[in-house]
A protein has these predicted regions:
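Feature responds to low-complexity, polar/acidic, surface-exposed segments characteristic
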Residues: 9-11, 34-54, 62-63, 67-115, ...
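C-terminal beta-strand-rich structural cap/linker in extracellular carbohydrate-active enzymes
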Residues: 21-36
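Surface-exposed interfaces of beta-sheet-rich extracellular modules
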Residues: 1-20
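Extracellular/surface recognition and adhesion modules
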Residues: 1, 31, 57-60, 119
């Protein structure tokens, strides 16, 4: 704001509302606007609001369930390991104290150590049966569904629903331990088949 001689007027105020003492002359007011970055924006360069998974990524990031693979990457297409999955569930539970079973291939210094111990102690995972958990192994669909099935049961969620999975051409290849979990997951809409009928 300037008076008719071009002298700047003193502005007072805050929060977008400003005042000045009106001089005995015409006043020229020029307003300039600056765009600010969306404070709600995620820090990841590989996740945009147009992505179908944006809201889910925002939720897990805002709630400290997942943090991404680096400061600016979430890596949404990265395959998930067994250690990652139990860590997600562990954080979802508020990272409770964990003690009990320790697998021979889970080093206490690893980020997933407490999560694996907690998951095993609560019957969410049981490992491979040879004393190993395989934390860095990529998790398969049937393993993931089995983990979620046991996690839901542990939370007191009704897991009695079943749907026939025999319509899928590869249903015969589902491991025996995972059949009930797959039937439950299909019944509740957690999974569906692929376009090729598998």
């Amino acid at each position: 704001a300037t008076d008719s001689r071009g002298n700047e007027l003193t502005l007072t105020g805050q929060d977008g509302r400003f005042e000045f003492i009106m001089p005995a002359s015409d006043v020229t007011v020029n307003a300039y606007f600056t765009a600010f970055e969306d404070a709600e924006r995620l820090p990841f360069t590989d996740v945009s609001k147009a992505d179908w998974f944006y809201d889910a990524v925002k939720y897990v990031y805002d709630n400290n369930i997942m943090s991404g693979t680096s400061g600016d990457l979430f890596s949404p297409d990265l395959q998930t390991t067994r250690g990652m999955i139990v860590t997600i569930l562990y954080r979802l539970e508020g990272q409770p104290k964990a003690s009990g079973i320790l697998f021979s291939d889970v080093e206490q210094s690893m980020y997933y150590a407490d999560a694996v111990t907690w998951a095993a102690a609560n019957g969410v995972v049981s490992g491979y049966g040879n004393g190993e958990f395989g934390p860095d192994d990529m998790i398969t669909r049937e393993q993931l569904v089995s983990v979620l099935y046991r996690y839901a049961a542990n939370k007191g969620i009704d897991v009695s629903g079943r749907a026939d999975i025999k319509q899928f051409s590869d249903a015969y290849s589902v491991s025996g331990y995972a059949v009930e979990a797959m039937e439950w997951a299909y019944a509740c809409g957690l999974i569906s088949g692929m376009q090729d009928g598998t």
